[in-house]
Amino acid sequence: MDDLLKVPEIVTNIASYLSTVDYLSFQQVNKRVYAIINGKNDSKYWSLKLTRMGLQQVHSNEEEEITLLDENDNQNSLRIFEIYKSFTAQNSKKIFVKFYRCYNSYARKLYNNNLANFFPTSYSNDPLKQTRILNFIKKYNFSNKNDIETFTRIETNFNILREIFINSVLKESELNYQSNNLAAVARFMKILLISNEESNAIEFFKSKADLPPSLTVLPSNDELFWAEQPREEDSGGSTVIFNSKNLDTFLNQLRDFLNEKIKLADILFKDEFPVILQFIESFIQDILLDILNNILLSYSEFLKENGKDSKANYECVPELYFTFIKKFDTELNDSVNAGANFRKVVRDLLNLYLEPFVVNYMNQTTRVFESLINSQLANYDTQVQDKQREQNAKIYNTLKDQTDASSASNNELPNDLSIITETSKTVPEADSKPSTIHQSVHSTDISNDKLDFLSSFTKIFKFSNNENQRLKQQLQLAYNLNLISNNLQNIKSLISLDLCYKILQETSEKTDQIYKFHTIESLLPLIKLRCQEIFKILITQLNKNHVKPAFEKAILLLQKYNPNEIEQIEIKFNSLSPANTQVEPLVQFTELINIGDIILQMISIFYKNELIPKKIIDKNKDFLNDVIQLKKNFETSIDDFVAEGLNIGINKLMDEISFVFKTLQLPDDYNPPPPSRNSPIRDIKPTKCAIRVVELLSNHCFLLTGATDKGTIDVYQQEIGERFFNEIVKHLKKCFISTEGAIWLICDLNYFYDFIANKLKQKNVVPYFVGLKSIGQLYIISGKDSKELGKLISDLGKFNGIFTQEEIYEFVQRRSDWVRVRKDVEKVMYGLGIRDCCIM
């Protein structure tokens, strides 16, 4: 044994496992052991004990001055850990001696399991001091960890003592709570917190905050919900689901219960331990969510009882959410225990647990909104089709009744049966209101008679000689033409502005309902996404199921419309008067354009006033958003339809102008017969054909005014002007024009120019008609001045650069005396005539 103690490592290792008393005794074994342990090894032993107690070792070259405590001071045990928080290797033993003198007596009692009269008399009636002493004893015992047997024995008995102490504290807390001595209970709660018994403190508080079962019993469905949901003025047009009075009464009890517990927590814990937040979270999770689910279930049953879709119970989520926020956040009392951010934390907790319900509401709202819009548009389409079928049946039955009556009265075709060809056009007056111009077969006007005759003539030979078959063919023809006319009149009804406005209102309401939840920060990206989906549904449904089909049908009707066919056929019998049916494709299509433009403007207003201010769409990054692309595609689609429809309309207008030129422009308009003694004097003014053509132009060129943007109007009017110019050119190249008739040609050309320059006012088109006016000079020059005529043809500047010399040559060929003047004209133009060729 003596040999072992001569080895320093063995001596040092043995010393490190000894208790304080044994270590001091081991130093006294012999001088050699003392020499080995003393010095740095001794400082290391005491430093390790202090470190295990929680003190911090600092490095210093000089030994610090130790403030000695009065050994007779009974308060040393309560203050020593506050005084000594650090040490150096040099003073470690001296500092440990101070702790040893304070707590070793307690450690010996615990080691010997002597728990009776454990605390000194001065601490016996002060549980708060006892708590602090117990905490310090536990820390002190860590210094014995090198002697595991001593440490474990003391630790075991300490835990027994501490458990007895905690139980006595809880018992005293209960007794004082029952006697309503909350101040005493608060002191005991503080003892539990100092003892690191937060869980016991929380459980004690929860045991005094149990919710009475009666407060969770919901009112009956009849008391809680409205059978007929009234509108609420302040709710943005949404319906009120709950009986607010009964719902408030029910929730107010829960709110008052929470306020009582907030007050209790403030008394018992003050701001030392935030027990109320944990309690409120448990209340939300265990009570409020259960109540919310029960309300949703009750509402489903209520809907089912009232013959409605029970799956629509999600509709009550917004009202419940904001009511819960109001009752269990806004109307809660301030809490000292929870701190200054109490309300924010409570709202965050409410949002956390209510978030799944809100997400489901937004998802369901988006899905149902799409279904609703689709249903509304489908219903409107069905109504339009039903109405159209009724109108078609009415037209057919009316015509059939007339035909049957005629057939029954006489086997021959009745004298009063007539096929009336009537041309009616609706054109804008100065105030943009439609006016109808009628042309009747009974007119004495020769030109109108000719037009009506030629129009009817194309059909009359198609009728069978068999009387019944003939009447059937007449009926079928009349029905088809009245049907086309009726369809054209109904073009503007293909799009319902009222329905679109209603859908936009519903879109705004749904967007507002979803955006109300924007205070839930974690849901803000999803809220924006759902609002964008609502807007996308609006555009997609309107385009796919309403606007696009309407324009496609309107364009199809325009394509089928032939202004040169019979526009109205009426079968009259006895006293039946003719019906006035108007065919006005461009007018009706223009109104459709106007409606489409209004819809686009409403969508743009909604976008600018709803989506941008609420930052649902970032205007600085909108080019990256598919919503904006969808909106632009919708606008482009309407623009394309408008362009296509207007192009077709212009084609039909040009066809009609061409028809007027062919039918109303009499051969003697520009090539009158030689005057005789009995022939009337003809006024120098535009021909009836020119007047009718300008009337058609006037009725159609200004249809778009106020219906769309100025750029579209300008393009439309310029296109009409240019194509009208081409129609005049083609028409003139087919006419024979005499020197005597040239004066009326010039009148017509001036009349056309006046309309283009002073009414249409499209600067790009005016030069064409300036050049066209000069064409009249080709015919006013007498045949005797044929050389002057040749010079005029060669002077291209006279025609404003509009026509080439070849085109002017074509015009001059329409002179009635061209055969006589041709030689002189060509000689001036080309220098030599054919007869001047010596070879010929």
Curated annotation (Swiss-Prot):
GO terms for cellular component: cell tip; cellular bud; cellular bud neck; cytosol; endosome; exocyst; Golgi apparatus; site of polarized growth. InterPro entries: Sec10-like, Sec10_HB. The modification Phosphoserine is found at S409. Residues 1-48 form the F-box domain. It is found in: Cytoplasm; Bud neck; Cell tip. GO terms for biological process: early endosome to Golgi transport; endocytic recycling; endocytosis; exocytosis; Golgi to plasma membrane transport; protein transport. Keywords: Cytoplasm, Phosphoprotein, Protein transport, Transport. It holds the Pfam family Sec10_HB. GO terms for molecular function: SNARE binding. It comes from the Eukaryota. Coiled coil: none annotated. Involved in recycling plasma membrane proteins internalized by endocytosis. Required for recycling of the v-SNARE SNC1. Present with 2700 molecules/cell in log phase SD medium. Interacts with SKP1. This is Recyclin-1. It comes from Saccharomyces cerevisiae (strain ATCC 204508 / S288c). The gene is RCY1.
